[in-house]
Amino acid sequence: MKVLILRPAELLSETIRRFREEGFDAYGCPFIKLIYTDFDVPEHDFAIVTSQNAARVLRERGVRLKRVIAIGKKTAELIEAEEVLLPSKFDSETLYEEFAEMLRGKRVVAFRSNAGSEAVKRLSEVADFREIQVYRIEKLQGEEQRREVEKVREGFYDAIVFSSSMIARSLLELCDEKCLEALKNIFVVAIGPPTAKVLAEKGIRAEIPEEYTFDGVIELLKSKKM
């Protein structure tokens, strides 16, 4: 099965290797780039880390936190902290639903990108909430990306994995009608409901893995026996 994996360059080679170890003919392309920014760490009772990219930045800068809520097991593994909690589903909406009461009246700081979900920001309704932008996301739409879109148009891939809503938007902006039709006829995976929603706006039905991780994607693809 030829699988196209869309995720930032910093994490792409590791993911491709993992898929190939599982027997997939894996390819990859970054449709976004990450631009890291300077930031300070304010006093807080709880920290929220929403991605592996944010966790990696904190680790590289030697930031040690106390109590952390992390989105994703891989994110949690990268964090230096006394305690790390995880929502039952690895998305911002579930984090809000499950931890809002715990965070009520607390000082909460969220380390994230400029393109994060609005759900986390709703914590400002119950907590002394601050958002720290540790990196910005910009779309990549150069020659490399256009070549991949052409391969999608021509039916080269059996499956494509979108790992974020921004990545989905970046690719879709390069898609003509033939590309959109091709996406409707291959197996599309979205890691999480927000990404699936972006694809659905263009009439593309995406499957969502039970666990919003690349391990979950692998299990989903294996279950389809394509």
Swiss-Prot record:
GO terms for biological process: protoporphyrinogen IX biosynthetic process; uroporphyrinogen III biosynthetic process. It comes from the Archaea. It catalyses: hydroxymethylbilane = uroporphyrinogen III + H2O. It holds the Pfam family HEM4. The keyword Zinc does not apply. Keywords: Lyase, Porphyrin biosynthesis. Transmembrane segments: none annotated. Its EC number is 4.2.1.75. It is an enzyme of class 4 (lyase). SUPFAM superfamilies: HemD-like. Pathway: Porphyrin-containing compound metabolism; protoporphyrin-IX biosynthesis; coproporphyrinogen-III from 5-aminolevulinate: step 3/4. The keyword Lyase applies. InterPro entries: 4pyrrol_syn_uPrphyn_synt_sf (IPR036108), 4pyrrol_synth_uPrphyn_synth (IPR003754), UROS/Hem4 (IPR039793). Catalyzes cyclization of the linear tetrapyrrole, hydroxymethylbilane, to the macrocyclic uroporphyrinogen III. Belongs to the uroporphyrinogen-III synthase family. This is Putative uroporphyrinogen-III synthase. It comes from Archaeoglobus fulgidus (strain ATCC 49558 / DSM 4304 / JCM 9628 / NBRC 100126 / VC-16).
